[in-house]
A protein has these predicted regions:
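Short, charged, solvent-exposed linker or helix-capping segments at domain edges/interfaces
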Residues: 93-98
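Non-catalytic interaction-recognition regions
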Residues: 1-92, 103, 110-592
Length: 592
């Protein structure tokens, strides 16, 4: 039980006994650093039902708790706040209960509960994953893991945008300029090779536009009449008609991209349970349009196009079917959502990890599904996030200046290597151990820097700053974990049995209090879809541990019971760091 769960019934009873008043809610908050106390009860709300001043009221309740609740040792009242000091016995008992609990903080899913499907990544198959995809993947993966740890079954999915004019641009450019190149013949990852041809198409397209404009065409006319764009449009029509040659090329080049993506995903440490492809889903939803028309949810215009009027909800009119009968993205997303629930009947909610430029789209999508009568629509959530910028500027993919995810990960590993080599202490490492350490530190720095920020906020990502071994960074936390592992390796005595400690040092108590927060932080992070809550909890835990480390001897402690307890406490902190970082997709090194 948590402290609020322990104290609330006793406080309710105290108010009934002392004032003959029944209350149904007790408000708690963390005790401010300048006051003594482990938890604070807010007195002000009670003044509405109890005729007393806050200090008198606080003192009466405090005295009652000291006399009747074993966990309460003393208290103090400051204005309208009752600061409660909890006994060492409570924290020692709590720690004894979690010391060997390898699943501490994690909740086992109930098979009867509905599952959650989390969508993330969802790339186009015409270029490599870039910096924006990195934030998307890290957020989606972490949120999925956190929701799973909170006690829900989770499916990780993505919808791959594998069709359309942008795909045909890469295909056409390869036909024109590729000379039969393959990933094998060039030594390039497949996604990078295909991305090169997307850039090549754009270059040729711009040259043709310039030529047409010099011949007297307007820019708008030139963009429409450039031969290469007309060829790409013709290729798209052939794809839609099922042309064998076009379909074969499409499958071949897409497979190159998938093979490249698989390497990036593996290096980034993310995975998926199921995949959806736009080529299979772009016609989904058209049947739903007729259902919507029959129910009066949609309306048909004279030109045959179908719309939904959401002006009363402040979202304007939205087209769901063009006049020529072709679907729009909204229609596809409606159909895909419905299909997912058909494929996975235990799914009762979905999380869409998509940038904030799509905020309007998802408001409309969720409202349409609600109006169509799907009960699960109330459990849809758009995990909206801001753009990631580098100090050198924003990304552009068509011009070949995109910040590739692969290049970024390599840069992070190289930066970590340079810093680690400058710090020294690597003489005993084999080349393989060094390479693993550099990757662990570099990717840990990247992931933590991105995930510690609230998803809604835009990020200016500074690679060198993220690899700093001091402050709120991944490497700082990893270093603390490795330091604890060193302590455990040096502990040449049995510390497995429960310590007979009876009095806690202030720093020990603060550390146990921080550990106690872990289960609640996981639940809050899941509820708010925010890995930042977990990341910053871990940083606070590490800061508390380093304060403890500086204040008291651990292996140098002469009292055996204290030494045993401090090693056990250190180990539990390390275990909690590792557990928390696992939910963020970050590895921890055994030594640094």
């Amino acid at each position: 039980m948590t402290l609020p769960q322990i104290l609330t019934p006793s406080i309710e009873k105290a108010v009934k006994v002392l004032f003959d008043v029944i209350i149904d809610k007790v408000e708690f908050q963390t005790t401010r650093k300048e006051f003594e106390g482990d938890i604070t009860m807010v007195i002000f709300p009670l003044l509405k039902v109890v005729k007393s001043n806050p200090v008198e009221l606080g003192n009466k309740i405090g005295n009652y708790l000291v006399e009747n609740v074993a966990e309460v040792s003393r208290f103090n009242v400051v204005s309208g706040f009752l600061n409660i000091v909890i006994s060492d016995d409570y924290y020692l008992d709590f720690f004894g209960g979690i010391k060997d609990d390898v699943t501490f903080g994690f909740v086992t899913p109930n098979p009867e509960d509905k599952a959650v499907m989390v969508e993330y990544s969802s790339p186009n198959t015409n270029k490599p994953l870039h910096l924006g995809h990195v934030r998307n993947n890290l957020l989606g993966y972490s949120v999925a893991e956190i929701i799973k740890a909170s006690g829900k079954k989770v499916y990780k999915t993505q919808i791959i945008n594998d069709r359309g004019i942008h795909i045909c641009k890469s295909m056409l450019a390869w036909q024109k300029f590729g000379n039969g190149q393959t990933p094998e013949s060039t030594g390039l990852k497949g996604d990078k090779l295909v991305g090169n041809y997307y850039v090549a198409f754009d270059k040729a397209y711009k040259e043709e536009i310039a030529q047409l404009m010099s011949a007297g065409k307007t820019e708008e006319e030139a963009k429409k009449q450039a031969p290469i764009i007309l060829e790409a449009q013709e290729m798209l029509l052939k794809w839609e008609a099922g042309d064998d040659a076009v379909i074969t090329l499409w499958k071949t080049m897409n497979q190159w991209v998938y093979d490249g993506f698989a390497i990036t995903y593996k290096n980034l440490g993310v995975n998926f349970d199921c995949y959806y492809y736009e080529s299979n889903t772009y016609l989904l939803g058209k049947d739903v349009v007729q259902i919507g028309l029959d129910r009066g949810v949609f309306e048909k215009d004279p030109d045959g196009s179908v719309w939904i009027d959401l002006t009363d909800e402040g979202l304007d009119r939205k087209i769901v079917l063009r006049s020529d009968g072709t679907a729009v993205y909204m229609t596809q997303d409606i159909g895909t959502a419905i299909q997912r629930v058909k494929d996975y009947p235990d799914v009762g909610g979905m999380v869409y990890t998509v940038g904030n430029e799509q905020d309007y789209h998802f408001k409309v999508l969720f409202l349409i599904l609600k109006k169509l009568g799907f009960d699960w629509s109330k459990n849809l959530f758009h995990l909206s996030y801001g753009m990631v910028d580098l100090p050198s500027g924003k990304m552009k993919s068509r011009e070949g200046t995109v910040v590739d995810a692969d290049d970024l990960m390599q840069e992070m590993t190289d930066t970590a290597q340079k810093i680690a080599e400058d710090l020294g202490k690597l003489d005993s490492y084999s080349p393989e151990e060094k390479a693993k350490l550099y990757s662990t530190i570099g990717l840990g720095a990247l992931k933590y820097y991105i995930l510690k920020v609230d998803p809604k906020k835009r990020i200016l990502f500074n690679p060198e700053e993220s690899v700093d071994f001091a402050g709120n960074t991944g490497p700082f936390i990893q270093y603390t974990y490795a330091r604890i592992q060193s302590i455990i390796r040096k502990a040449n005595f049995d510390f497995s049995n429960k310590s007979k400690m009876v009095v806690l040092h202030e720093k020990e108590k603060e550390l146990v209090k921080q550990l106690e927060l872990f289960p609640e932080v996981i639940q809050n992070a899941a509820q708010h879809h925010s890995p930042a809550l977990l990341a910053n909890f871990t940083y606070d835990l590490v800061r508390e541990y380093n304060s403890f480390y500086q204040a008291v001897p651990i292996l140098g402690e002469e009292d055996l019971e204290k030494k045993i307890f401090r090693v056990q406490l250190s180990k539990k902190v390390a275990d909690t760091i590792a557990a928390s970082f696992s939910l963020l997709g970050i590895n921890v090194p055994e030594r640094m």
